[in-house]
Amino acid sequence: MLSAEELDKVEAQKKTAEDLAFFTIGYEGITPENYLNKLIINNVKLLCDVRKNPISMKYGFSKNQLKNACESININYIHIPELGINSEKRSDLNTMNDYKRLFDEYEKTTLVENVDQLERILNLAHKYQRIAITCFEKEPRICHRSRVADSLKKLPAWDIEQRNL
């Protein structure tokens, strides 16, 4: 996706910090190149895809395309479908109240039923030091990844700085 020259330019901007960090990132409204640049600049070592179905109409963001792109720039990729939301539940979201209702239900069901996956992310964060979770929406408050991030903060052993890219 990136030429050697483009990759060198992005690498030059890369954060040298190796401290523990956790990011959330959405790909809505940006190109695959811009998305990958954000990961490189923030020295992300592992991308966790929390979409239920990692298929995208947007070029570069379906599971295999994204996995291959990440691996080509030495970023590991894993898919954690257990933390996704079924697409039929997302079909009638028109207001912020609709999103809030959906995410409140998600928090009470999916996240409670999948604490093992949250603990898995915690363990991966300690292993890789700098990780990100990803989904589609640009704005975290209208994406379930914000609820995943909030639930991670509640884990007793969670002591990691979080920010949205």
Please place each PLM-identified region on the residue numbering.
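Residues lining hydrophobic/aromatic ligand-binding pockets adjacent to catalytic sites
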Residues: 1-165
